[in-house]
From Swiss-Prot:
One of its GO terms (cellular component) is cytosolic large ribosomal subunit. SUPFAM superfamilies: Translation proteins SH3-like domain. GO terms for molecular function: structural constituent of ribosome. It comes from Azoarcus sp. (strain BH72). One of its GO terms (biological process) is translation. This protein is located at the 30S-50S ribosomal subunit interface and may play a role in the structure and function of the aminoacyl-tRNA binding site. NCBIfam families: rplS_bact (TIGR01024). This is Large ribosomal subunit protein bL19. The lineage of its organism: Bacteria, Pseudomonadati, Pseudomonadota, Betaproteobacteria, Rhodocyclales. PROSITE patterns: RIBOSOMAL_L19. Belongs to the bacterial ribosomal protein bL19 family.
Length: 128
């Protein structure tokens, strides 16, 4: 392992100390709590939408969340390990067959819906 990778791992460990980043994938509906500074006070702003892309590049990892706001599609890119991202919460798992869901940009209404992924393993455990 080279020196740069070692430094990146240390920085990731420092940035994730005290917060957990859940495992999520494209198609999942997530709520990202973002720290917003207004004047001299800071507050958390919730941004809920569908993850349409995820980029795994160590410290430079990021993901794109798309939501419909007032009938208009809005996309926002978040750095996974940014100090401005307070929490990431997975609301719903999506069942998709693509890594990048850019085709959702051309779709609206019911055609832009994503089927929910059913977890058969946990359902079988609850029955027993």
């Amino acid at each position: 392992m080279n020196l740069i990778q070692l430094l990146e791992q240390e920085e990731i460990a420092r940035l994730t100390a005290g917060k957990t980043i859940p495992a999520f994938a494209p198609g999942d509906t997530v709520v990202v709590q973002v720290k917003v500074k207004e004047g001299n006070r800071e507050r958390l702003q919730a941004y809920e939408g569908v993850v349409i892309a995820k980029r795994n590049r160590g410290l430079n990892s990021s993901f794109i969340v798309r939501k419909i706001s007032s009938g208009e599609g809005v996309e926002r890119t978040f750095q996974t390990y940014s100090p401005l991202v307070a929490t990431i919460e997975v609301k719903r798992r999506g069942d998709v067959r693509r890594a990048k869901l850019y085709y959702l940009r051309q779709r609206s209404g019911k055609s832009a819906r994503i089927k929910e992924k059913l977890d058969y393993k946990s359902a079988a455990g609850k029955k027993a």
